[in-house]
Amino acid sequence: MQGRSSAWLVKHELVHRSLGFDYQGIETLQIKPEDWYSIAVISYVYGYNYLRSQCAYDVAPGGLLASVYHLTKIEYGVDQPEEVCIKVFAPRRNPRIPSVFWIWKSADFQERESYDMLGISYENHPRLKRILMPESWIGWPLRKDYIAPNFYEIQDAY
């Protein structure tokens, strides 16, 4: 079964893969990293003017990393906005995904957190650096193959 977003992308010959619907009926699409930025721009023009959330996760030990975007069409007088979930998978060795900061400013800290925790590099992000961990931290704590250090240095909050 194909949703509205998938049908629209097919109509305009944009490469994607439908992953079905979640329990709320929101369609999930898979987009290749090299196609993501152009599809993000097109989605914004199509009316997805709000990035509700962006997160990332490690699919499997030694496997792919995923960056997930929840987009919403906010329109005056519409009480049930149209939503879509987009997943972009990247290889673990060199996870690079185009940043959507220049389309949705709310992606700023969310992409930085995904970088900090999983090491996904968001290309053309204006200030991609750690946001939760110290700059000197080694590794990506939310990766399934991450080995936690035996000790932590206690630091002042000042």
UniProtKB/Swiss-Prot annotation:
Question: Could you tell me where this protein is found in the cell?
Answer: Plastid, Chloroplast thylakoid membrane
Recorded GO molecular functions are: NADH dehydrogenase (ubiquinone) activity; quinone binding
Q: Which UniProt keywords apply?
A: Chloroplast, Membrane, NAD, NADP, Plastid, Plastoquinone, Quinone, Thylakoid, Translocase, Transport
Q: Do you know which InterPro entries this protein is assigned to?
A: NADH_DH_suC, NADH_quin_OxRdtase_su_C/D-like, NADH_UbQ_OxRdtase_30kDa_su, NADH_UbQ_OxRdtase_CS
Catalytic reactions on record: a plastoquinone + NADH + (n+1) H(+)(in) = a plastoquinol + NAD(+) + n H(+)(out); a plastoquinone + NADPH + (n+1) H(+)(in) = a plastoquinol + NADP(+) + n H(+)(out)
Q: Which GO terms describe its biological process?
A: photosynthesis, light reaction
Which family does the record claim for this protein?
A: Belongs to the complex I 30 kDa subunit family.
Q: State how it assembles.
A: NDH is composed of at least 16 different subunits, 5 of which are encoded in the nucleus.
Q: What does this protein do?
A: NDH shuttles electrons from NAD(P)H:plastoquinone, via FMN and iron-sulfur (Fe-S) centers, to quinones in the photosynthetic chain and possibly in a chloroplast respiratory chain. The immediate electron acceptor for the enzyme in this species is believed to be plastoquinone. Couples the redox reaction to proton translocation, and thus conserves the redox energy in a proton gradient.
Q: Please identify the protein, giving its name as recorded.
A: NAD(P)H-quinone oxidoreductase subunit J, chloroplastic
Per the record, the gene is: ndhJ
